[in-house]
Amino acid sequence: MASNIFSRLVPQDRGRSFYEDLRQTDPDADLESRAGIDIDEENLNRSYHDYDLDEAERLAGDESHISHSRGDVAGANTVHRRGQKANTARWLGAGVEDDVDNDVPESLLVETPRAPQHLLLSPSRAGPSHPRPTAVPGPSTRQNQAQWEATRHQQRLHNDDTMPHGPFSGRAGQGRPEPPPVGLMAGDPYEQAMWRWVNVSNLDNFIKDVYAYYRAAGFWCIIVQRILELVNAAFVAVFLTFLSQCVDYHKLPHSKKMEDIIIPKCTQNMSLVWNVGLWLFAIYFICRCFGLIIQLRQLKHLRDFYTHLLKIPEADMQSVSWQDVVGRIMALRDSHPRTAGNLTRVQRAWIGSQSKERLDAHDIANRIMRRENFMIAMLNKDVLDLTIPLPFFRNKQHMSECVVLAISFSILDFVFDNQGQVNPEFLKASRRRQLSQKLKSRFFFAGLMIFVMSPFIALYLILVYFLTYFHEFRNDPGALGARTYNSLAKWKFREFNELDHLFNDRMNMSHPFAKRYIDMFPKRKTEQVARTVSFITGSIVAVLGLATIFDSEAFLTFEITPDRSVLFYVSILATLWAVARGNISDDNEVYDPEFAMKSIIEFTHYEPDHWRGRLHSTEVKNEFSELYKPRPQIFLEEILSILLTPLVLLVSLPNSTDQIVDFFREFTIHVDGLGYVCLFSVFNFQQGHANQKQAAAADAPDNREEYYSTKHGKMAASFYGFLDHYVINPKTGLPGNQLPGSRQQFQHPPSFPGLQSPTLAADMRHSRMMRERGRSSGVQIQGSQGRTPQFRTPMPQPSPMASILLDPHHQPAPGAFGSRSMHRSRQMAVPHRGGYMSDRDIIEEAVTEDGQDDARFGKLGDEDIDESGGALDESTWQTSPTKTLSRENSGANPQETEVGVLGLIHQFQQAHMHLRR
């Protein structure tokens, strides 16, 4: 609601935007662009093709100011648009002769056929041209006509029209889709859904809508949620009107019936302010109803997309996983590959950020969290000054939902354009001063609007919070001490490319450990006072309770103090007793705050450098308590934030405008097919250790390396958290997002050494030693993780490179895992002492005796091989469904110090195959 109010109160310039005014009023910038001699950076490294000549001819006839005549090859006679002045380039002088030193024969010169003069007229005079329709194969029936046109639209073999259609049609920046073919809208729902998918003009908004539809659990859940929101809003308005305008509170002490205190015809005697408020609410309510009706069409399209294209029925929307949705989107993309090669300049510019080829799990997360990634990075790099300019709050960062909305409006809405992309003008160093001044003005406007609306927003939040939680606090007084993470903690803990539902799940799993840590920490003085209060209040309540047993009717009306009966004091004392008991620790609880904090860090992935080695200290407990606060305290801070946010926007944040502009310029990169994204959100899957360097940058003496790195190991934690969600199978805890039995398998043929084999005894001793080592190291070998017997076909295991949710260029290298990703799920489920993987040392790697890193070369150490059940006689890895396992790309370690007879046979087979090649 607050964001909608912001967008409606912002002065909108329908004529031109701030960036257009900036380009026109800056005389020193873009001189090359105005002179026509700037470098085309977009096509600087692009290869030249023959079909570019056709595009150049079309541009010359439609848009260009310069075109050659039909008979003039050497000169350049210009043809102008009507009403425009000729603007000939300096290097295309009229009558310039060919270079006499040119050794290329004229017969080898490639020239495009010149268009007639009547085709070089302006589009307004020439008018649109309609090509002759192609004949329909077979009988010309209505059904065949509709199918033929749908096929021509989806699988176009040659250009039937003079101008491109679909999402590439129109001028740059428009991307208007082609209108549906005749008869398609009345045809098959699958064809309709496919047509809408092919003609998506803004891929970012579409993917966000798909994700929002998934979060809301389908069509009917969204409809019910929207209707109930309207019902709740109407109830609050009617209920408050009744309580404030229709009840005579002066008659309440002396009345016994509702009719005695109700004011007759109260709606006709309401105050002017309340009448205006009700009319404004009525307008808002009607707009929401019309918005819901209009939104039904979009929701129906999303339902068709899930049902017909992704093959996910409406009944499964509440139980399907997001990984399954991503996999089906990739399958839909792969089933309709792009075959067009002769793209125009407008098409290339459009596909630079809207390409459907960039739709794997990594790209989808980047599209959904394009804005949030910049927000996470700004808070991690301490770019924003969020301190309160008051004497007692200068050292505290103030982050609330109100501040988040203000930052989203002031910064993100200014940086991003209507297409969801970073405006290129914001990335130019020459615009730094103007952009900084504009940010200051936006901060001032946002602070002023929040200050004006603060009384109404505060009153609304207080009423809603009171009506929501009063019954809960009354029935369970201990809920007053329930804690949760505040807004600052959520943005500090959130990782790059981590979607909302994944982040919420991670935070929810950390709540039991956080509560245990807070309750465990020494509070002896508080407990002593709580025990005394509990004893006194409990004793009084017990005596009063026993007295009510003998004569309940007379004793409950007995007044202990004037106008205060026994029932009143019993309720008050019972509440105090419950609050006191809630502050007393359990007698069976084990005191170990360091172990409890390690369990929290396993889920939050947040451990500042000054926490290391001091997890038991009171300072760490106080810092964590600032992030994990009681719910009533968070609510009071949100109410107070409405008054403090204008101070932050008017005083503190304007000091950070230069740093904000520099941050976006230095930490924004362009990815082909994806557009502008945050630097830290692009993971280097091929070199997993490159992401780990982000975590160790604090130890590096190079200030430049530290400047371009994240703090507290955020980059490494985000990278491995992403692998856990999209590479590690959540059902098995192993790499790969398919069950092992449903994937391609490679099994070595079983070989049985004879009983007289001289190596049989040694091999059996070796197997016994490996099992003993596994038991001594505390490794639990059970189920599919146990070591396969020597004389049986081994059980195949997944490959860390096998993820169907990542494209080949995003497939992680074996060294990116080490042994960490294989076992991190189990470590997070059951934390153990000394087993915490910090953000900086987030990779657990096996080191050989020579000191070399096995994980760097994609190998496993001895303990890892023993734990995973892999050896030379076993199939240790399994490839993705689109690739077959070969001996070169398998993850098995071909070198081992001790090998048995099966290992020797396997090495002999490998050597024999290499010789045959």
Swiss-Prot record:
Residue ranges, Lumenal side: 248-275, 561-564
Keywords: Acetylation, Autophagy, Cytoplasmic vesicle, Endoplasmic reticulum, Germination, Glycoprotein, Golgi apparatus, Lipid transport, Membrane, Phosphoprotein, Stress response, Transmembrane, Transmembrane helix, Transport, Vacuole, Virulence
Top-level taxon of origin: Eukaryota
Bias (Polar residues) ranges: 875-895
Compartments where found: Preautophagosomal structure membrane; Cytoplasmic vesicle membrane; Vacuole membrane; Golgi apparatus membrane
GO BP term, pick one: autophagy of mitochondrion
Secretion signal span: none
Mutation effect (K621R): Disturbs the acetylation levels of ATG9 and impairs the binding ability to vesicles during nutrient starvation induction
Intramembrane segments: 443-463, 634-654
Known function: Phospholipid scramblase involved in autophagy and cytoplasm to vacuole transport (Cvt) vesicle formation. Cycles between the preautophagosomal structure/phagophore assembly site (PAS) and the cytoplasmic vesicle pool and supplies membrane for the growing autophagosome. Lipid scramblase activity plays a key role in preautophagosomal structure/phagophore assembly by distributing the phospholipids that arrive through ATG2 from the cytoplasmic to the luminal leaflet of the bilayer, thereby driving autophagosomal membrane expansion. Required for mitophagy.
Subunit-level organization: Homotrimer; forms a homotrimer with a central pore that forms a path between the two membrane leaflets. Interacts with HAT1.
Domain topic, free-text comment: Forms a homotrimer with a solvated central pore, which is connected laterally to the cytosol through the cavity within each protomer. Acts as a lipid scramblase that uses its central pore to function: the central pore opens laterally to accommodate lipid headgroups, thereby enabling lipid flipping and redistribution of lipids added to the outer leaflet of ATG9-containing vesicles, thereby enabling growth into autophagosomes.
Designated name of the protein: Autophagy-related protein 9
Native organism: Pyricularia oryzae (strain 70-15 / ATCC MYA-4617 / FGSC 8958)
Name of the gene encoding the protein in the UniProt record: ATG9
